[in-house]
Amino acid sequence: MNHFVYLMDKYGNPYSFSLKPKYYKTLVLSGGAMRGVYLLGALNGLKIKINKISTFIGISSGSIICFLLSIGYTPYEIFISLLKYDNLLTINLDKLYSGDTRNEGGLFSSENIFKHLETQMRLKEISRSITFKEHFEKTGKILIVMAFNITKCKEDIFTYETTPDMEILNSLKLSARIPIIFGPIKYNNNFYIDGGVWNNFPIDIAIKYHNKKNKKKSDWIIAVTTLFSTYKQNIHQWYKFSNINIVMVNDTPDLNPSLVSSDLEKLTMFNKGEEKASLIKKQNIRRNSI
């Protein structure tokens, strides 16, 4: 019996999806700004048991979603909160006309994004200053966030083990810094930009962490991105790992989402993600019933 559905990434490399795992222990989400709504739809369509996930790994907008999932939100609840909160992106008009991109960086402000995030934290009785260590002690979940350190030209990884006293909000601000839109941000005498610039789909981090912790063979990883998001061609080397399921949601060709996407665009993305995930599951079930 063939337990797998075989699919293709944007480079034509095959990857697979299996119905074997009853639940997942590790979740990986790519970056992609508002394209993260596709990922929320996919997670909802897969009917993943979020409460069974012990490790959340995210880049850029994926890191924000991972954090919200780790404190108890469902993919659908996060999606609904985005429909209720439209003004995520604020234009820095003074900087737009002057060309000054210092301080907060870029031509736009991320202030409203993090105001919205803080609101969601308060609703779950999570302190805005919660650190990685406090988060782990409170939730029992491991959160791994990545950002690109342009001062040292390397990827920095933030976890309760490497940066226990770092406030999670600070790590998310470092990770979700899309170049030009937001610009670099300074932290501990280093400047950071969006983690997706270096590694937008960190499957490798999940597998290395899995091996480092001597995880069981029954501990599966689920990794979700959009088909045409930014990921390197050599990512296919990680597809062969036996305990990973990958979902790449087909981006809608006529939709170019931004941080000011309309509710209709958000709904379209969520539905596309949900449809893709549901289709993969149906194909797998159909194949195994023949």
Swiss-Prot record:
Motif position, GXSXG: 58-62
EC top class, as a word: hydrolase
Topology with respect to the bilayer: Multi-pass membrane protein
SUPFAM superfamilies the UniProt entry points to: FabD/lysophospholipase-like
EC number(s) on file: 3.1.1.-
Keywords linked to the UniProt accession: Hydrolase, Lipid degradation, Lipid metabolism, Membrane, Transmembrane, Transmembrane helix
Motif DGA/G positions after renumbering to this chain: 194-196
Protein name: Probable lipid hydrolase 463L
